[in-house]
Amino acid sequence: MGCVQCKDKEATKLTEERDGSLNQSSGYRYGTDPTPQHYPSFGVTSIPNYNNFHAAGGQGLTVFGGVNSSSHTGTLRTRGGTGVTLFVALYDYEARTEDDLSFHKGEKFQILNSSEGDWWEARSLTTGETGYIPSNYVAPVDSIQAEEWYFGKLGRKDAERQLLSFGNPRGTFLIRESETTKGAYSLSIRDWDDMKGDHVKHYKIRKLDNGGYYITTRAQFETLQQLVQHYSERAAGLCCRLVVPCHKGMPRLTDLSVKTKDVWEIPRESLQLIKRLGNGQFGEVWMGTWNGNTKVAIKTLKPGTMSPESFLEEAQIMKKLKHDKLVQLYAVVSEEPIYIVTEYMNKGSLLDFLKDGEGRALKLPNLVDMAAQVAAGMAYIERMNYIHRDLRSANILVGNGLICKIADFGLARLIEDNEYTARQGAKFPIKWTAPEAALYGRFTIKSDVWSFGILLTELVTKGRVPYPGMNNREVLEQVERGYRMPCPQDCPISLHELMIHCWKKDPEERPTFEYLQSFLEDYFTATEPQYQPGENL
């Protein structure tokens, strides 16, 4: 039925308040959503105290249910409060075990039991079969969660990453929950102009007291679906009309199956090692399969690297860490040789990607965005009161679309090799380690911040070893005397200043990862708006 109230008068001109600047919108356009930017003013010479900084950090994509949502627990009822709501599949799914169901996009289900959280017992109305289905692959029939364009809890920066992915035309759009206003939504649209090139505009969708929705009060709608239909037919004040929903990509599963959710020590025979991806000091990394049908990464540890008992204890904590910028731990084989089974990232380590892969051609905006993703994952680790202890580009993995995820968090504490535990031994990563951690074993989230500063140098130098020309002993001595790496070639001074603040001698003076995430996400609007690509960066 369309527009509840839709006046044909010109849309009121609103100022576009975006990324700290005010620009008058042209023509008949609405102003884009003035999402507040959570950074202090950043000058070249002085940086404020970061540690009291609070930002609304963006979370990963949770379409419906899954680990970031509590909306799918308990009894499932229809709007009238009786009976059972039907759910519809948003994606195809291939069964991994005899307990779960294969299904196709569009298939409808009756939910029999939703108490397992991420896995629901369901009956397919197409086949009549009963089994478990991943809860984030389905949504209630006719709900906004079932719409192609609805992305749920997706942060502003992640919305921009998805919309700016290669191949999306101007007018690609999505709707997500507002980060700043409870009950409201944001419409994010890919746009293009001569000045900015490809970019994303965000519009706040506000809710009326009677349940309707509007971007401007001149055009009000009973449902979000009607709003989308209206702006798909005409721009009507937006930057352009809505052309096509953004591609969602498959949701991430945090378990291999419903059985491994709680019992995730698995038999070695269920794993097949297919292709060796890397060989390190303490073991190898393989691409393989679980159960013959699910692609995984398998880290095999040399016997004696760590105590199986200590590893299993730490793995209990690691399994509970769930964030879209952390490599998900799926399962373990806890008898030696220990196997660690995680999600597979097809581009390998960030270090190899920068030195020998596609990363060699990347310019500063991509590199800063990758750093922002790492900071987002570390901000989650910070919130969870956990510590990584070995943050460097070799322990960051890369996937399609320059997606970065943190791997091997927490494992360094368990290593029993004397060449490592001595901290000045040959296998210990001195060049990435904060002095208080290297000298006195004081590992904290603030020593991780130091390591992040070193990782920033790896990014802008495309994988160069830190402190070139210096050995570990020299690095330790020089850093204790106050030496810090100079600004790398072509690196903006403002980014080097951020590194220097990560390398403050007093750990408490170093920034939080929450601040680092926000600063890097808004770097090219708040700090370096005049950036022009150079030969290297």
From Swiss-Prot:
Catalytic activity reported: L-tyrosyl-[protein] + ATP = O-phospho-L-tyrosyl-[protein] + ADP + H(+)
Species of provenance: Homo sapiens
Annotated protein name in UniProt: Tyrosine-protein kinase Fyn
Residue numbers with lipid attached (N-myristoyl glycine): G2
Domain SH3, first and last residues per copy: 82-143
Renumbered residue ranges of the record's region Disordered: 14-35
Regulation of its activity: Inhibited by phosphorylation of Tyr-531 by leukocyte common antigen and activated by dephosphorylation of this site.
Keywords assigned by UniProt, alphabetized: Adaptive immunity, ATP-binding, Cell membrane, Cytoplasm, Developmental protein, Host-virus interaction, Immunity, Kinase, Lipoprotein, Manganese, Membrane, Metal-binding, Myristate, Nucleotide-binding, Nucleus, Palmitate, Phosphoprotein, Proto-oncogene, SH2 domain, SH3 domain, Transferase, Tyrosine-protein kinase
Residue numbers carrying Phosphoserine: S21, S26
SUPFAM superfamilies per the UniProt record, alphabetical: Protein kinase-like (PK-like), SH2 domain, SH3-domain
GO biological process, alphabetically ordered: activated T cell proliferation; adaptive immune response; axon guidance; calcium ion transport; cell differentiation; cell surface receptor protein tyrosine kinase signaling pathway; cellular response to amyloid-beta; cellular response to glycine
Protein task: Non-receptor tyrosine-protein kinase that plays a role in many biological processes including regulation of cell growth and survival, cell adhesion, integrin-mediated signaling, cytoskeletal remodeling, cell motility, immune response and axon guidance. Inactive FYN is phosphorylated on its C-terminal tail within the catalytic domain. Following activation by PKA, the protein subsequently associates with PTK2/FAK1, allowing PTK2/FAK1 phosphorylation, activation and targeting to focal adhesions.
Protein kinase domain mapped to chain residues: 271-524
Gene: FYN
Gene Ontology MF: a single term: identical protein binding
UniProt-annotated catalytic positions: D390 (proton acceptor)
Effect of G410R: In a metastatic melanoma sample; somatic mutation
Residues of the SH2 domain: 149-246
Its EC number(s): 2.7.10.2
Quaternary state and interactors: Interacts (via its SH3 domain) with PIK3R1 and PRMT8. Interacts with FYB1, PAG1, and SH2D1A. Interacts with CD79A (tyrosine-phosphorylated form); the interaction increases FYN activity. Interacts (via SH2 domain) with CSF1R (tyrosine phosphorylated). Interacts with TOM1L1 (phosphorylated form). Interacts with KDR (tyrosine phosphorylated). Interacts (via SH3 domain) with KLHL2 (via N-terminus). Interacts with SH2D1A and SLAMF1. Interacts with ITCH; the interaction phosphorylates ITCH and negatively regulates its activity. Interacts with FASLG. Interacts with RUNX3. Interacts with KIT.
Lipidation (S-palmitoyl cysteine): C3, C6
Residues the entry annotates as binding ATP: L277, G278, N279, G280, Q281, F282, G283, E284, V285, K299
Subcellular location per the Swiss-Prot or TrEMBL entry: Cytoplasm; Nucleus; Cell membrane; Perikaryon
